[in-house]
């Protein structure tokens, strides 16, 4: 089987990445719907698109093939027209569209070509678009928008030669996974060539990609958070370890505090070089508040080593932790809120970051890390950074370096 996914680290030279260009779903956000849709603010779409285009240009300028989930999903339906009606059925079912609107919605969505249909599924559909006027106080949508599709890190995760197709924590976001699931099962580029290590219909437990960090070819680090459970990690690990082509033997599970600051592991902790990590001070200041587990073929056990000791053991060298916001409590809080730890590596020691996090950027540069910056006045309103907005599909394998 020809390999279509190759991600054995967070820092290997990035060759192919999957993103979503912000669309009309941004303009369907209202202050009243933010909590329901798990978004933190109302961005200005035109500026968000410009910021995102600048972000993807940096990646292309650095030799990265940039793929878009909306285009891949549409291409899949173009390649396999027989899938279209079944996919529409699935979307209508998972969007929880009321029975009285289903026929009208189906007629509307079916009238669009595949690309416009996928974009409309993501954007959401207002009742007024279908000529339904129930008054100002009525709920405005037949199908809710999916603004978090912007964050392609979460619905699935590339691990080694395969992926996890995640069961997400909220009903609001779980519908996002139907697009990559369609692509990896049926797109001519990927079909029958990508092993699944987790399935979106495993409903008992949840796991999200923002909690999964691919440290190297043997070890993963996964956060146990509000959105990712230890049982889900164990279920994923069992399938991963039992794949004869998998090189993985260990998962370090960090049982983090279940708070907004620790929503996902990558909101507080990211790998940026062979021996360098960026972390919010809370992850170390609260070290006594969470447990660390090691998951292996032998089972799950609590370990008493510190996180730095575990990282050094796994990396085979002493590691350096760069504190987001430095030692300034105010700066650390502000920059963590604006995704200061959430950078994406183009290669070892070269990352893309939001330019607004200038304290952290200065510390990174002083530590020898090359930092490319992007504007983020609008992109940051969703509380996700460059790592959140990207899912690597191919990274070059890391070269061993002398210690």
UniProtKB/Swiss-Prot annotation:
Alphabetized UniProt keyword annotations: Arginine metabolism, Cytoplasm, Hydrolase
Protein name: Arginine deiminase
Catalytic activity: L-arginine + H2O = L-citrulline + NH4(+)
Pathway where it operates: Amino-acid degradation; L-arginine degradation via ADI pathway; carbamoyl phosphate from L-arginine: step 1/2
GO biological process, one term: arginine catabolic process to ornithine
Keyword ATP-binding belongs to the record: no
Subcellular localization: Cytoplasm
Family in the record: Belongs to the arginine deiminase family.
Positions of the catalytic residues: 388 (amidino-cysteine intermediate)
Molecular function in Gene Ontology: arginine deiminase activity
Organism: Mycoplasma capricolum subsp. capricolum (strain California kid / ATCC 27343 / NCTC 10154)
């Amino acid at each position: 089987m020809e390999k279509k996914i190759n991600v054995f680290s967070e820092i290997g030279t990035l060759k192919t990445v999957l993103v979503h260009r912000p669309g009309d779903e941004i303009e369907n956000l209202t202050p009243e719907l933010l909590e329901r849709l798990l978004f933190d603010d109302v961005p200005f779409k035109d500026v968000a698109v410009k910021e995102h285009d600048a972000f993807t240009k940096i990646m292309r300028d650095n030799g990265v093939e940039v793929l878009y989930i909306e285009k891949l999903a549409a291409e899949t339906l173009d390649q396999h027209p027989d899938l279209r009606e079944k996919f529409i059925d699935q979307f209508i079912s998972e969007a929880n569209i009321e029975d009285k609107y289903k026929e009208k919605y189906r007629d509307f969505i079916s009238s669009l070509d595949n690309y416009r249909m996928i974009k409309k599924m993501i954007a959401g559909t207002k009742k007024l678009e279908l000529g339904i006027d129930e008054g100002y106080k009525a709920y405005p949508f037949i199908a809710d928008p999916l603004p978090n599709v912007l964050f392609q890190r979460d619905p699935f995760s590339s691990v080694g030669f395969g992926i996890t197709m995640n069961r997400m924590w909220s009903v609001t976001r779980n519908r996002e996974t139907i697009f990559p699931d369609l692509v990896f099962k049926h797109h001519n580029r990927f079909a029958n060539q990508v092993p699944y290590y987790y399935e979106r219909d495993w409903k008992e437990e949840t796991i999200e990609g923002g909690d999964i960090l691919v440290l190297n070819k043997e070890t993963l680090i996964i956060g146990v958070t509000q959105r990712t459970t230890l049982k889900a990690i164990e279920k994923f690990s069992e399938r991963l370890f039992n794949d004869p082509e998998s090189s993985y033997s260990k998962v370090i599970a960090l049982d983090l505090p279940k708070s907004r600051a620790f929503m996902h592991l990558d909101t507080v902790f990211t790998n940026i070089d062979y021996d360098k990590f960026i972390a919010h001070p809370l992850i170390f200041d609260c070290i006594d508040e969470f447990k660390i587990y090691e998951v292996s073929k032998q089972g799950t056990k609590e370990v008493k080593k510190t996180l730095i000791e575990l990282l050094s053991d796994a990396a085979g060298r002493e590691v350096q932790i760069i504190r987001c916001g430095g030692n300034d409590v105010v700066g650390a809080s502000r920059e963590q809120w604006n995704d200061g730890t959430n950078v994406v590596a183009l290669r070892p020691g070269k990352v893309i970051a939001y330019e607004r996090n200038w304290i952290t950027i200065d510390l990174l540069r002083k530590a020898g890390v090359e930092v490319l910056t992007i504007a983020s006045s609008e992109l940051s309103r969703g509380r996700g950074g460059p790592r959140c907005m990207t899912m690597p599909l191919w990274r070059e394998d890391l070269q061993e370096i002398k210690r």
